[in-house]
């Protein structure tokens, strides 16, 4: 099997990440190395793992401050680029919702074409009905404005040869999954249900999820602007047919406001000092494998 680096993003989830990593170490085949990005956790990690003889290394990148998942992912990928890593890279979250058992499917799929990006598309979500309704509305709106149907999250595979491309813009700091969809048109897909969190409840609320949805769409802001102009033109023609300008004015103002929001989000990210050099936010690197030798 080609050299595979597994990259796990974590924040205050020592218990869950321990279960996730143990599950990974019990797989056959296994990744060659594991990199855990500790996104400024306030709780101290005391991770110790067995069955590590096959691993080249298992490292923890401790970030100075919490920068949230998307920038933490970018930090890890920049680190792999700096280290001149060659091979496949698997990105997953540490909350247990990304099922480690599907790593076997990723390994098999990556053998067919190691340089082809792979996404893990979710087939089932255990969410409350209001959230499911809002999620479907978001999928419809995002498809209408971007022509992208995004049913995958951070759980994915990409090759080291793709690092320059995905890190060429700041889009990855807005939304990693959307950046994959934007930069890599041809992707292989693996379908998998989204598991429940191992411990605790998600700290995301409707406000934070709405903010994240806007950041996802802002990755495609230029396409959204073009599609918005087309929609405004169509609404103008419709308003002439029904002899009413209310529909036209509503769509015009709504899309104008929406475009201002997503362009402002992108502007804020581009001007943020945090994303200018994410590697400076790495406080230290722990080698867990060395601690066991």
Q: What positions do the PLM features span?
A:
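N-proximal low-complexity "stem/linker" segments adjacent to membrane-targeting elements
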Residues: 1-23
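Conserved short acidic donor-positioning loop in nucleotide-sugar-dependent glycosyltransferases
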Residues: 12, 39-41, 67
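Short, acidic, metal-binding catalytic loop of nucleotide-sugar glycosyltransferases
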Residues: 22-31
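Short beta-strand/loop segment that forms part of the nucleotide-sugar
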Residues: 31-41, 61-62
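A conserved acidic beta->alpha catalytic loop
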Residues: 38-47, 96-97
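Acceptor/aglycone-binding surface of glycosyltransferases and processive sugar-polymer synthases
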Residues: 64-65, 70-79, 91, 97-174, ...
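Catalytic donor/gating beta->alpha subdomain of glycosyltransferases that bind UDP-sugars
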Residues: 164-223
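Terminal low-complexity segments of carbohydrate-biosynthetic enzymes
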Residues: 225-293
